[in-house]
Amino acid sequence: MAARRTILLGLCASLALTGTLATGASARLHYPLPPDSTAVNGVAQQKVSHARMPAQEIRLAPLPDKGLHPGAALWLKRPYAGTPTDVLRYHNDNYPTGWNPNETDLTPASVASASFGQITTLNVDGNVMAEPLLVSNFQMPDNSTHDVLIVATGHDTIYAYDAQTYAVLWQRSLGTPQSTGDVGCSDIKPEYGISSTPVIVRSAQNAATIYVVAATEPAHLSFHTKLHAIDLGTGKDLMRPHEIAPAASLETGGKIHFDPQNQWSRSSLAYANGAIYMGIGSHCDSNAGAISGWVLRYDAATLQLTGKFNTIEAAAGYELSSVWMSGYSVALDPAGNVYAITGNGNYSLTKGHKGYGESVIALAPDLNRTPIGTFTPSNWQSLNNGDTDFGSGGAMLLPVAPGQTAPPMLVGMGKAGTMYLLDASSLRGLEGQGGYQALQKIQLSACWCGAAYYAGPAGGVVYYQGNGDLLRAFSVAIDGTPSLTQVAASSDGAGSGGAFPVVSSNGATSGTAVVWAIERGNPTEQIKAYNAATLGAPLFAANAGNWSNGSRSYLTPLVANGRVYVGAFKTVTVFGLTN
């Protein structure tokens, strides 16, 4: 069901902080490695095959409640040893890799020590589905300087906290959220408000804009979805919010419209080249025959709609083709091209029946009507018939490494548990047609999840954790035979649906990388940390909040400036070092 469903890595700080992408014709992605690093060439390749695990509701055995670390008060006075960094969008960058390469305090050694633990819990007014975001060293209108933590809730509230003292700098309600009962879909309870991670565009030390989508119901059964541009310093709208209401003409006549009751902004927002991008999915596959998935583009300066792509072009039963990706954002390459994966829906390129269900789609920056490339699994019909969305997982671009002879690559995965490695520069339609094949297919566990990437001292590594499965690490071969090879695995499994891991490290320095993942249970959420090089047993594990339906939480932690933030039901739990 639908709701059950640049930085150039190691790049200059200013590019990472603004979330902007390099322009130009090339769609190759690059990151520099330190001189003593080696690419993953010549590694023996292997096929990794694991039986697909069925979807399951997992109840985690609660960990002993460690509560606040005894040194929590000391942590509030502890300065960050490195240069503070910003996290302005979902999963850190536009690929989106989930890698923060600017972390100096949190290492495998420090996280495993007795000095690491829970610092505090922030109480908020609703579900925290959106990843918290962080703006460091920001000058407020009164000229005071703060590291600002942004938290958005399902109750349509945005909080701005001082990320040292956790005093509330401001909070803002964007309206009355939509009632789950009125919407008619109870995947998320009790309300739908802000569900997608906002994106922040920072232009100066004292100037930043939060772009956020809020679903509201100001009167009974009066549904609205609006894009806001909010001043980070004051919490006020910088311009009139824009009603999200795209429409498109169909090849078969008539129009398709956005449905604010049965559709929502679940895919996180992204920013590139002056534009805000978002994906639109459906609630519980409701009103399936009358709605389409969308990728939308808005001018960041005016909030006006400047581009749209509807994933169906002909009216027919059970179309949908939602762009929801369990909260993962669209991916953007350095040329500004947009990549997404669609969910349940028909696939056809025949006029009068055209649709892009169960597909990776690549779109030009302006979202021109014709995709620049697509990939559709050969078994798309069985995926569609079995509610086994390809689009329950996100698309992640892999950075092009120095000396890489392989083409730019993309990984994607979904409920069927197949991880596809694709040539991102040559997406050529239906798998098997004309001999077209993925670069590699690896059978793993079902995914309501997303991958992460880290460029370590031995080269690129992809991290993936599916439903009830182990966290797995795959090295990336970048020679003429591109492939993924499993090189490590955790000793413990995931919760319901899998995880959205993130990686923190001090660049590619050996011994500094940690993989973080939220294990989703019902109702308990747990945060776990692993040595990125070896995985194995967790370095640290702790309860980090509850959720009314853990398999639907789709949570991603924020890791930056020596701290870890985990959103849950009406809380954000903060972890860090005390000395």
Identify the residue ranges that each predicted region occupies.
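Boundary at the C-terminal end of the N-terminal hydrophobic targeting segment
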Residues: 22-27
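Short, intrinsically disordered, charge-balanced linker/junction segments flanking boundaries
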Residues: 39-45, 490, 508-520
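A beta-strand-loop signature enriched in Asp, Gly, Thr, and Trp
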Residues: 472-504
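N-terminal pre-domain segments of enzymes
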Residues: 28-99
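Bacterial N-terminal signal peptides that target proteins for export
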Residues: 1-11
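Mobile, glycine-rich extracellular loop/lid and propeptide segments
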Residues: 71, 75, 82-402, 407-430, ...
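Inter-blade linker and blade-boundary elements of WD-repeat/beta-propeller domains
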Residues: 432-444, 485-491, 544
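Bacterial N-terminal signal peptides
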Residues: 10-20
